[in-house]
Amino acid sequence: MKVNLVDFRNSIKLTQKEMAEKVGTTLSYYSKIELGLRNPSYNFMEKFKAKFVDANMDEIFFS
Protein backbone atom coordinates (compact mmCIF):
# COMPACT_ATOMS: atom_id res chain seq x y z
CA MET A 1 0.00 0.00 0.00
CA LYS A 2 1.34 3.41 -0.96
CA VAL A 3 1.68 5.75 2.00
CA ASN A 4 2.53 9.39 1.53
CA LEU A 5 3.32 12.08 4.07
CA VAL A 6 -0.33 13.09 4.52
CA ASP A 7 -1.38 9.47 5.07
CA PHE A 8 1.42 8.97 7.57
CA ARG A 9 0.52 12.13 9.50
CA ASN A 10 -3.15 11.17 9.57
CA SER A 11 -2.30 7.66 10.76
CA ILE A 12 -0.57 9.08 13.84
CA LYS A 13 -3.38 11.59 14.35
CA LEU A 14 -1.37 14.80 14.18
CA THR A 15 -2.28 18.14 12.64
CA GLN A 16 0.08 19.79 10.19
CA LYS A 17 1.07 22.24 12.93
CA GLU A 18 1.84 19.44 15.40
CA MET A 19 3.86 17.56 12.79
CA ALA A 20 5.83 20.68 11.86
CA GLU A 21 6.64 21.25 15.53
CA LYS A 22 7.76 17.64 15.99
CA VAL A 23 10.24 17.87 13.13
CA GLY A 24 11.33 21.40 14.02
CA THR A 25 10.12 23.32 11.00
CA THR A 26 7.54 25.96 10.23
CA LEU A 27 3.95 25.14 9.41
CA SER A 28 4.35 26.95 6.09
CA TYR A 29 7.34 24.84 5.02
CA TYR A 30 5.74 21.60 6.19
CA SER A 31 2.49 22.38 4.38
CA LYS A 32 4.37 23.06 1.14
CA ILE A 33 6.08 19.67 1.41
CA GLU A 34 2.71 17.93 1.81
CA LEU A 35 1.29 19.83 -1.16
CA GLY A 36 4.29 18.95 -3.32
CA LEU A 37 5.31 22.60 -3.68
CA ARG A 38 8.67 22.03 -1.95
CA ASN A 39 10.95 19.05 -1.75
CA PRO A 40 11.96 18.09 1.77
CA SER A 41 15.49 19.14 2.63
CA TYR A 42 18.06 16.65 3.86
CA ASN A 43 17.85 18.33 7.27
CA PHE A 44 14.06 17.89 7.33
CA MET A 45 14.37 14.21 6.45
CA GLU A 46 17.02 13.64 9.13
CA LYS A 47 14.79 15.23 11.77
CA PHE A 48 11.77 13.28 10.50
CA LYS A 49 13.63 9.97 10.73
CA ALA A 50 14.92 10.82 14.21
CA LYS A 51 11.36 11.45 15.46
CA PHE A 52 9.70 8.59 13.58
CA VAL A 53 12.28 5.81 13.71
CA ASP A 54 9.93 3.10 12.44
CA ALA A 55 8.65 5.14 9.49
CA ASN A 56 9.42 3.73 6.05
CA MET A 57 11.12 6.73 4.44
CA ASP A 58 11.14 5.20 0.95
CA GLU A 59 7.41 4.55 1.08
CA ILE A 60 6.55 8.00 2.45
CA PHE A 61 8.83 10.20 0.36
CA PHE A 62 9.82 8.24 -2.74
CA SER A 63 6.81 6.22 -3.88
Annotate the PLM regions.
Residues 1-12, 22, 58-59:
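A short, Lys/Arg-rich alpha-helix, primarily the initiator
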Residues 5, 16, 27, 42-45:
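Helix-turn-helix DNA-binding elements, focusing on the entry/boundary residues of the two helices
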Residues 6, 25, 52-53:
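Short, functionally important structural connectors and interaction interfaces within domains
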Residues 13-31:
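Short alpha-helical DNA-recognition segment
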Residues 43-59:
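DNA major-groove recognition helix of helix-turn-helix/homeodomain DNA-binding modules
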Residues 63:
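Short acidic/histidine-centered micro-motifs embedded in hydrophobic/aromatic stretches
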